[in-house]
């Protein structure tokens, strides 16, 4: 079994990565492989609602959306991580997920999913809610934890200091593993 995780931060080794890594390492202890897919900082287009993607994938082939979709279709579960900007998921993450789910959302039905939000302080709950809506409309069961799936940290490395947040990530991984093994 394998879980594909999306790092929605432009910072490849920032706090969002660290939260996802914590989930992944616990998954590994549960006997489940994982991969962290980095969106990166390259330009990313918004969905234009052309509808052509339902036939051949997203018509924009100059970024990572179609690559992610191919990997996501092979994965057994998905975890999406976002940094929080102005009490909301990053615009890059939303544009990316809009295109992923518009073009391929039905392919993910019955795969468990989870979202992780990382912020200095506020906005994580609102971001968590927005991210989980992608799962809800795509017939995907949502994995939770012992608290909302969030971690606090502003500058890279601060997430390490959020003991409760890191424990929440490990608990999330255990719950996701349980769902995958059912």
Label the model's feature ranges.
Residues 91-92, 104-149, 164-167:
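Short, glycine-/small-residue-rich phosphate/pyrophosphate-handling segment
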Residues 1-103, 155-182:
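N-terminal beta1-alpha1-beta2 submodule of the flavodoxin-like/Rossmannoid cofactor-binding fold
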